Amino acid sequence: MAKPATVKIKLVSTADTGFYYVTKKNPRNITEKMTFRKYDPVVRKHVEFKEAKIK
């Protein structure tokens, strides 16, 4: 079987709440770390989420 093209990553909140989203990315197309402004329900605001590895 072939190796899957996408890998699962964790988007961790920069507000240090411990909240995170899980998404997929293709590391061949996107080599840099992903950052998004998404909603953090713990602080009830949009904050920046940065990519981290899933352990």
From Swiss-Prot:
Gene Ontology cellular-component terms listed: cytosolic large ribosomal subunit
Pfam families: Ribosomal_L33 (PF00471)
GO biological process, one term: translation
Keyword Mitochondrion: no
Entry similarity comment: Belongs to the bacterial ribosomal protein bL33 family.
Database matches in PROSITE patterns: RIBOSOMAL_L33 (PS00582)
Molecular functions (GO terms): structural constituent of ribosome
Name of the featured protein: Large ribosomal subunit protein bL33
NCBIfam families named in the record: PRK00595.1, rpmG_bact
UniProt keyword terms in alphabetical order: Ribonucleoprotein, Ribosomal protein
